[in-house]
């Protein structure tokens, strides 16, 4: 009987080893898939960061332009209010 039990044990170990190898292969395939997706997401993030940097520089220029317009409008409106006060 003990030889029969040993044979069953050995077969069980072999099937566990085989199934363990299949599990490991499946896990490695899943890991590879996740790493591929991560690499793609990082490339997308890098492109978005580049675009954001370009847009931030454009917004800086736009902000300077608007500041100039506000200063010019303030000067014109300030002169008009001074003239109105002198006229009264």
Swiss-Prot record:
Its GO biological process annotations read:
attachment of mitotic spindle microtubules to kinetochore; attachment of spindle microtubules to kinetochore; protein transport along microtubule to mitotic spindle pole body
Assigned protein family? Belongs to the DASH complex HSK3 family.
Q: Which organism is it from?
A: Chaetomium thermophilum (strain DSM 1495 / CBS 144.50 / IMI 039719)
Keyword field contains Nucleus: yes
Q: What does this protein do?
A: Component of the DASH complex that connects microtubules with kinetochores and couples microtubule depolymerisation to chromosome movement; it is involved in retrieving kinetochores to the spindle poles before their re-orientation on the spindle in early mitosis and allows microtubule depolymerization to pull chromosomes apart and resist detachment during anaphase.
Molecular function via GO = microtubule plus-end binding
Q: Where is the composition biased (Low complexity)?
A: 1-15
Supply one GO CC term from the record.
Answer: DASH complex
Pfam families for this protein: DASH_Hsk3
Its recorded name reads: DASH complex subunit HSK3
Q: Which InterPro entries match?
A: Hsk3, Hsk3-like
Subunit structure comment from the entry? Component of the DASH complex consisting of ASK1, DAD1, DAD2, DAD3, DAD4, DAM1, DUO1, HSK3, SPC19 and SPC34, with a stoichiometry of one copy of each subunit per complex. Multiple DASH complexes oligomerize to form a ring that encircles spindle microtubules and organizes the rod-like NDC80 complexes of the outer kinetochore. DASH complex oligomerization strengthens microtubule attachments. On cytoplasmic microtubules, DASH complexes appear to form patches instead of rings.
**Keywords for this entry?**
Centromere, Chromosome, Cytoplasm, Cytoskeleton, Kinetochore, Nucleus
**Region Disordered, annotated ranges:** 1-24
Q: Subcellular localization, per the record?
A: Nucleus; Cytoplasm, Cytoskeleton, Spindle; Chromosome, Centromere, Kinetochore
Q: Does the keyword Magnesium apply?
A: no
